[in-house]
Amino acid sequence: MSTSVFNRRWATLLLESLTRHGVRHICIAPGSRSTPLTLSAADNHALICHTHFDERGLGHLALGLAKASREPVAIIVTSGTAAANLYPAIIEAGLTGERLVVLTADRPPELIDCGANQAIRQHALYASHPTLALDLPRPTPDIPATWLVSSVDSAMARLTHGALHINCPFAEPLYGADDGTAYQDWLMTLGDWWNSREPWLREMRQSTLVVQPDWPQWRQKRGVVLAGRVSAEQGARLAAWANELGWPLIGDVLSQSGQPLPCADIWLAHPEAASLLRQAEIVLQFGGSLTGKRLLQWQEQCQPQEFWLIDDLPGRLDPAHHRGRRLVADVGEWLSAHPADKQTPWADLLVDIADRTQRQVDAHLASHFGEAQLAQRIPALLPPDGQLFVGNSLVVRLIDALAQLPQGYPVYGNRGASGIDGLISTLAGVQRATAKATLGIVGDLSALYDLNALALLRQSPAPLVLIVVNNNGGQIFSLLPTPVAQREAFYCMPQNVEFGHAAAMFGLNYVRAESWEQLADTVSDCWTQGGVTLLEVVVEPKDGAETLNELVAQVAAWTH
């Protein structure tokens, strides 16, 4: 038997099986042990191949592709620590639901735990974070092709969210001429399957939406709607639905609901707002991953008669552990099955408080160029028919608290584990999936953490602006009660860098904006001229955190 040739046949069948389940994008890192998978992917015309030299970034590239395409995305890496570097992306996918198919090449069993090079224990490498795992045997024609395709089909049919880890051991030799006629009899046992686009094994799973029988009674009550991480279409529908009910909707930065009560993370500090919201008899939360500190505090402390959380991800998504109902359902389908009944708004005072807060924010930031002003004015920078990617740490909190994003405008972020790793890589994946003009915004430490992902931006299919807010360190810790004496050295960790050389190294356009006017003009030019621009905005380190705290204190002190 020619081991290298049969390895290719095995890998070819494996990848072809994945395409029958909607896999179009595959992300590949360089490696020798993964050669059968890589060459088979390159030969499969149904696959779009993406490459990156850093597996950690590669995983997040796949995450972004899956996030924006809403399709399963495959990843190929070689054995050893290459596979371990995918861990952060797998964790994030497990928390936010993107489907990743992780193909880790491995040494055969006789090379494990014996000192062989680049051989680690890859069984259960990612512990409980993948939704599913499939440990394949060493390729051999003694195993029927029908076993391989049906094993993949069964796993993919059950992959409704999160990652599927498929560990793929390959024995040497890995290279050699491919005899196109060898082992065709093994493949041809699948007959006319090769001429179809269907899986070999079609597992049918029916999940029927459960309509809440008492909804007609509850929709007559005083309700509050919390909108967390939902899609753009769902966010727009949710806003219209809540408005029909006459219920206040408090929208997160990732809700894409238009945030009809803007600046919620500021006005929730107002005593009258808190008092009014305590009158809610039912709270409905759609989607998880709420961002704002005061919104999270209110969500934790609220005590309605009923608390329902609706999301298509399974499991508990309520860290406050409310007594109530956890409804696993597509948000759009749930709204259709639970129509609104037009009611008179019961909490109009919140509209007045939110409007007053927004005016206060506008006035406070009108003439002060800095991180807070940039966050508040992000809507003015958005490309028409484009999308926004928001980083983590301080920047997402400022945008959540200060900006009012357009209803139905696509907004992406990694708010599962909320790490600062892989943000630029995820941004690259989001844009490749949609080919839309894209505005991204991250902090300086986030940019440093994923600096080599700037290489991925060189292949952007549409105009892209990456704003790096350089506040010289992790200034999110200025919002937290970290010990002042140790804050700078052990928490914020300022690096005193500028990003012009990084942009030049990867051949990207670079602008350092010194004023709002320069920043806005630069972004506008980028949308018309195209290309990729790294736009650095150097701000006072504590500007964003201090401004947010000042505004919260001002609103909390209002007497009427």
UniProtKB/Swiss-Prot annotation:
Q: Which cofactor does it need?
A: Mg(2+); Mn(2+); thiamine diphosphate
Per the record, the pathway is: Quinol/quinone metabolism; 1,4-dihydroxy-2-naphthoate biosynthesis; 1,4-dihydroxy-2-naphthoate from chorismate: step 2/7; Quinol/quinone metabolism; menaquinone biosynthesis
Q: Which UniProt keywords apply?
A: Magnesium, Manganese, Menaquinone biosynthesis, Metal-binding, Thiamine pyrophosphate, Transferase
Organism domain of life: Bacteria
The record, for Pfam families, names: TPP_enzyme_C, TPP_enzyme_M_2, TPP_enzyme_N
Q: Which InterPro entries match?
A: DHS-like_NAD/FAD-binding_dom, MenaQ_synth_MenD, MenD_middle, THDP-binding, Thiamin_PyroP_enz_TPP-bd_dom, TPP_enzyme_TPP-bd
Q: Which GO terms describe its molecular function?
A: 2-succinyl-5-enolpyruvyl-6-hydroxy-3-cyclohexene-1-carboxylic-acid synthase activity; magnesium ion binding; manganese ion binding; thiamine pyrophosphate binding
Q: Which GO terms describe its biological process?
A: menaquinone biosynthetic process
**Stored PANTHER family:** 2-SUCCINYL-5-ENOLPYRUVYL-6-HYDROXY-3-CYCLOHEXENE-1-CARBOXYLATE SYNTHASE (PTHR42916), PROTEIN PHYLLO, CHLOROPLASTIC (PTHR42916:SF1)
Q: What does this protein do?
A: Catalyzes the thiamine diphosphate-dependent decarboxylation of 2-oxoglutarate and the subsequent addition of the resulting succinic semialdehyde-thiamine pyrophosphate anion to isochorismate to yield 2-succinyl-5-enolpyruvyl-6-hydroxy-3-cyclohexene-1-carboxylate (SEPHCHC).
Q: Which HAMAP family match?
A: MenD (MF_01659)
Q: How does it assemble?
A: Homodimer.
Query: What family does the entry list?
Result: Belongs to the TPP enzyme family. MenD subfamily.
Q: What is the name attached to this protein's record?
A: 2-succinyl-5-enolpyruvyl-6-hydroxy-3-cyclohexene-1-carboxylate synthase
The source organism is: Pectobacterium atrosepticum (strain SCRI 1043 / ATCC BAA-672)
Q: What is the lineage of its organism?
A: Bacteria, Pseudomonadati, Pseudomonadota, Gammaproteobacteria, Enterobacterales
